[in-house]
Amino acid sequence: MVSEWCYFKQHFSPEQCQDIIRRASLLPVSDASIGKGGEFAKDEDTRRSIIRWIRRTSEWADLFTDVDLLVAKANSTHFQVAYQYCNAFQFTEYDESYQGHYIEHMDTFLAFPNVHRKLSVSVQLSDPADYSGGDFEFTKCGQVPNPINTRTQGTVIVFPSITYHKVTPVTKGKRYSLVAWYEGPQWR
């Protein structure tokens, strides 16, 4: 690996971000679960958020193609890991009313025997003026990006799924993000 993360600042315009928020908000709500020991469970001490799944369908084809190309570019220049696909994006809402957050974690479930999450993606959909707190942060990382850049609306962050990260509690307003995991053969 050449680096621990990379980002594409303001890749999506504010109008594109608002369109994603509007369309994704119409999708059914799912439980925000976490992976522990090969199982999924709800744990509000670890994670408080509302999620909706965006499936890889013709309605969302342009978004998937766009993010797929960014991940391929990031992988080629920064990570060089073996990955194969991403089935769905997670549209996530963190709200002040329940102090939306996600404590330090990594996205790979090493207990799964066949496929591992290899590259993670986080897209900042909200205007940073619309909320306080809710910072996406890398932890246990040698070098971290400037928080101003990771809060910029439309920015796409790509990183290996074994990298620890968190979202601090939202203290005012609401933060929306799009999250994706590109899977592939087991980490070695």
State each model region's role:
Residues M1-V156, I162-R188:
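Fe(II)/2-oxoglutarate oxygenase catalytic core
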